[in-house]
């Protein structure tokens, strides 16, 4: 396992925010998993922490295929997690509505631009996320209808159902949409909790513990 900084936001009045990634294996960029983009996505961050633990054990046992790389980013919004606020910064920006961003914009735009530049070349992209409205959810996979979506692959998560959504203009600012626009097979995974941990749904959503066949390209 190799821990590296994906992007750093410098601050005058508080500690810098480092977006950290955990890389397993070397070679082709096979799969990238992104966790909490909003400050209340504790469940999503927890799933990524368990995923890092599992992948580290697999790597130590020589079970990561040669020439394959997996990257896990547990959170891209540690500032909001630390102060228990859903959105980012004084302008309350929704990170998952700020893609693809740009290098000369607001902090949220610079963050998403740097992140997408780092992760856009992966074959598979998985985002653990929450819906933009409050509600109760059965764990499921959701993706945008861009012409690049692949519901057959989404079914391999083994979750109860897959939702394909026709994007409206605001959806074009999401990570899922922009990942697909970069030709990454992107999947958004929803569980039934956000701000607290639910072990059962966390295990159900974990793509290594559960029979997600895409990982056969990365893991023996």
Language-model regions, residue ranges each:
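Structured catalytic-domain cores with a bias toward divalent-metal coordination
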Residues: 1-220
């Amino acid at each position: 396992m190799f821990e590296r900084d994906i992007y750093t936001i410098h601050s005058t009045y508080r500690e810098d925010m480092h977006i950290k990634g955990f890389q397993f294996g070397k070679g082709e960029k096979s799969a990238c998993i992104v966790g909490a983009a909003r400050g209340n996505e504790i469940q999503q961050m927890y799933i990524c922490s368990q995923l890092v633990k599992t992948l580290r054990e697999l790597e130590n046992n020589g079970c990561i295929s040669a020439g394959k790389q997996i990257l896990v980013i547990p959170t891209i919004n540690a500032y909001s997690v630390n102060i228990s606020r859903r959105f980012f910064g004084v302008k309350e920006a929704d990170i998952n509505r700020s893609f693809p961003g740009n290098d000369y914009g607001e902090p949220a735009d610079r963050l998403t631009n740097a992140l997408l530049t780092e992760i856009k070349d992966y074959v598979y992209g998985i985002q653990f996320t929450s819906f933009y409205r409050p509600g109760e959810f059965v764990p499921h996979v959701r993706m945008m209808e861009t012409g690049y979506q692949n519901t057959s692959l989404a079914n391999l998560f083994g979750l109860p159902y897959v939702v394909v959504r026709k994007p409206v203009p605001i959806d074009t600012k999401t990570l899922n949409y922009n990942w697909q626009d970069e030709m990454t097979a992107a999947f958004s995974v929803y569980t039934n909790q956000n701000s607290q941990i639910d072990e059962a749904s966390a295990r159900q959503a974990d793509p290594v513990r559960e029979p997600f066949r895409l990982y056969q390209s990365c893991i023996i």
